[in-house]
Amino acid sequence: MYLIAGLGNPGLKYRKTPHNAGFMALDALADALDARFSKKGNGKVAEARIGGEKVLLVKPQTFMNLSGDCIAPLAAYYKIPSEQIAVCYDDKDLPMGKLRIRAEGSAGSHNGMKSIIARLDTQNFPRIRMGIGAPQGIRLMDYVLHKLSRQEQAVYAQMAQDAAQAAILLVREGLAAAQQKYSSKAH
């Protein structure tokens, strides 16, 4: 069983903001797998299958900085090893629209990832980093929470579709296949 999480903040106020790129990816993934989210614990959860593999889709509803409070208990309950937990999230250090898939690593400056790493007590889990390309001269908090323009929404929609397909490929064929196909694609 895999757990695929997408990070974001709950509520309409945050819906079309860069910080909710992970939620956008999970919505695209749920659509592709014909799965429906329902409230479970501290998150919105959907069950699906990718090939013969059962997959738990998770959108934490704890707000970004406490994402681990949702993901870690679900992983423990379902006995999912960290290597089978993939997290989709916004990354300010990548150009907008670019994906980078990694097997493990630090959280960098991302507080949601810091929370997950702390609660899982490991950095050893795959992540699908979604480029939001934070520009110079704007406070990071202001940038990640700004409403996306129509042009940005189109880029994010395509990036979310690609992240969803990367997650499917990761489960079906493994991390290396997903990295090879999606880690260098930009929009």
Task: Locate each region found by the language model.
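Nucleotide and nucleotide-moiety/phosphate-recognizing core
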Residues: 2-104, 113-128, 136-139, 146, ...
